[in-house]
A protein has these predicted regions:
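Conserved S-adenosyl-L-methionine
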Residues: 261-270
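A conserved beta-strand element that flanks and buttresses the S-adenosyl-L-methionine
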Residues: 149-151
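A short, conserved alpha-helix within the catalytic core of class I
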Residues: 158-174
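Class I SAM-dependent methyltransferase Rossmann-like catalytic core
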Residues: 1-36, 41
């Protein structure tokens, strides 16, 4: 299911309008390192790292259930199909072969840069179980690097008491800046997107085959013959929207953590989809 979420995020880029705010937040807090929580398959934080002009030096991804192939899966990209000579000649008066070579070199350079700046913590990270300056994973305690904590499309997985516990632990024990973003909400546009999810899954499946090389016959059978996958993806999206937290509820939670300065709001993203953002940073005394 995370494959479909990743593909949808790459195509529609719903979080891109918020990247400027995140970049400014990092600058204000003088941060060049990010620890992404509940990363799953990566998604938006990888896009942010790729398009940000070198402010972010290192990104650590983490999850309670990290992918077994982690970084290889995250950084896998496939060169786009080459454009025809005729299209290049119509677009610009230069050698099409020179443009093709330049485009391919740019792709390889970006991929190499991404691989060198992104790491996936191999240990399972349970963000609800903290010790001072560390996180607990079953019986293993290990230090989490310093840096801004980010979360994308993750907050709706937690209840209000859990969100408060998470924020308070980060504020009192980590003392690191926090940025959380959600495209799931109870807004009508969000439910409209959920309604067309089955159609999107039908179109995204060939993309998974071409771009991520997910060549499993079961995926096609459970998508086109017996549409179990579209049903589960749709239900997952619906439940996520229903479990999302409103701005008012989050403001009430964060008001109980006066040690941090909090900024909570909504930015309009692609297709007018609302993006909820939460920024928290240690209060200057």
């Amino acid at each position: 299911m995370t494959d479909y979420i990743r593909a949808a995020l790459e195509i529609w880029k719903p979080y891109h309008p918020i990247f400027k705010k995140l970049d400014n937040f990092l600058a204000v807090n003088k941060q060049t390192q990010i620890i992404d929580l509940c990363s799953g398959s990566g998604g938006p934080i990888l896009a942010f790292t790729a398009q940000t002009n070198s402010r972010v030096r290192q990104v650590f991804l983490s999850d309670k259930f990290p992918p077994s192939n982690s970084i290889n899966y995250l950084t896998h990209t496939k060169d786009p199909p080459k454009k025809t000579c005729a299209r290049y000649f119509r677009a610009k008066r230069e050698s099409p072969f020179k443009s093709i070579i330049s485009e391919k070199n740019d792709i390889l350079a970006n991929k190499t840069a991404l691989q060198s700046s992104v790491s996936y913590l191999p240990q399972p990270v349970d963000i609800l179980r903290y010790q001072p300056s560390s996180m607990l994973t079953s019986d293993i305690s290990f230090n989490i690097p310093f840096g801004t904590r980010t979360m994308f499309t993750a907050l709706h997985h937690f209840s209000a008491p859990q969100v408060y516990r998470l924020f308070r632990n980060i504020a009192l024990k980590d003392r690191m800046p926090l940025a959380s973003f959600e495209v799931t909400s109870k807004h009508p546009i969000s439910f409209l997107m959920i309604a067309i999810t089955p159609v999107l899954v039908f179109f995204l499946t060939p993309l998974l085959l071409w771009r991520y090389k997910e060549r499993r016959i079961s995926r096609f059978i459970l998508t086109y013959c017996l549409p179990v996958v579209p049903l589960f993806v749709t239900l997952d999206g619906l439940i996520s929207c229903m479990n999302s937290h409103s701005n008012n509820s989050l403001k009430k939670l964060t008001s109980r953590i006066p040690e941090y300065d909090w900024t909570i709001g909504v930015e309009r993203g692609a297709w007018l989809l609302p993006i909820q953002y939460i920024f928290g940073s240690p209060r200057q005394v």
